[in-house]
């Protein structure tokens, strides 16, 4: 099931965030803080017991929504969870963009399967190198 994140999900999402190459803890914290103004949205994929097993952090921008973070628990990968999160995000936004490390073939393959196309290369985007910008 896909739902909006709740503040009570924060510990589980923080654990999931550790699987990301370059996490943004401040952005996730702000998106989950009901008292903070943040345009970011966090969608959560849950197991049968409503425990988060993946999430997508989306930030709306000028005519597009940027997928800032997408992560699935390693024990639940290859179950269609990332695809479901992207589909739920796409249902709320006409255009999506995402940046991916060139050597992250699993992520690049996922985004291509979900209809994203490579828009351009961004040198020195990540702390450890370049990124590819994908659009859908």
State where each predicted segment sits:
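Acetyl-CoA-dependent GNAT
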Residues: 4-77, 83-87
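C-terminal "cap" of GNAT-fold acetyltransferases
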Residues: 6-7, 97, 101-105, 114, ...
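Short glycine-rich hinge loops at helix-strand junctions in the catalytic core
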Residues: 80, 115
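Conserved acyl-CoA
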Residues: 84-96
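Conserved short alpha-helix immediately C-terminal to the canonical SAM/SAH-binding motif I
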Residues: 85, 104-107
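Structural preference for long, well-ordered alpha-helical segments within the folded cores
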Residues: 88, 109-110
